[in-house]
Amino acid sequence: MSHELLRQPKWRVIDQSHFGPLFDAKQSFAIDDALCTAVGAGQSDAVVRTWVHENTVVLGAADTKLPYIDEAISFLRQEGYRVVVRNSGGLAVVLDSGVLNISLIFPETKNTIAIEQGYEAMYALMAAMLASYGARVEAGEIVGSYCPGSYDLSIGGKKFAGISQRRVRGGVAVQIYLCVNGSGAARAELIRRFYELGRQGEKTKFAYPDVVPTVMASLSELLGCELSIDELLVALWRTLQSFGGELYSSALENGEWNWYEQYWARIVERNETALKGELLAGE
């Protein structure tokens, strides 16, 4: 399986997988928006960014409309998790030291990239990356998972990853979270309790997922071997190279930091608004 979007002449690699507990998920959303702007303006090659955040639950805008959201968020914080509202769609997901996030950032200046194309590119990359482990990766909604979607990635019917997209100023960010190690069911149980406390049996206009923890697992659980974030990083870079592109390491540059500051201010304001300000006192 391959995809033309993966055949970039150069890939700019930005690895932020070892920044530690002070690295806030809000920073990642602002960084991806800044990189989308740079790539869309033709000031950067295509980007592959890898990132890890410790003990964070990222909510979608719809999650903040739960009738008992205050109690649900208090529960997450008591369990030791930061709570962040993302700047795009989707629903609640768990990030921790065993979850690898990957962003592929493409320019949309010459040719329009259909939404389906973005998803298919990430699916193709993951299928190729995991083929060496003997895994057959499938794409399709896994009912009972958290943040369900038509591009849930699964092995043997158990979800280990979810894909999303964001488009900013001519740049397209295709993002995936990969549950590399740890318990997929334990992560799902956390989100099941979040929705249980957030709804408390009330009917809601939005159809929140009824999470079934047993339909989710980590790659380590599914493949029967203990995988590390670093091992998956090497597999990712080797797989990208196999599509013919040159990879080089990089960090954000001066102009990108200026854009980052703007997007950071927006995401902070969004979180203060979505979480009604006083909820942030727990962070």
From Swiss-Prot:
BPL/LPL catalytic domain segment(s): 42-248
EC numbers, comma separated: 2.3.1.204
Keyword Cytoplasm on entry: no
Protein name according to UniProt: Octanoyl-[GcvH]:protein N-octanoyltransferase
Transmembrane segments: none
Stated family: Belongs to the octanoyltransferase LipL family.
SUPFAM superfamilies per the UniProt record, alphabetical: Class II aaRS and biotin synthetases
Gene giving rise to this polypeptide: lipL
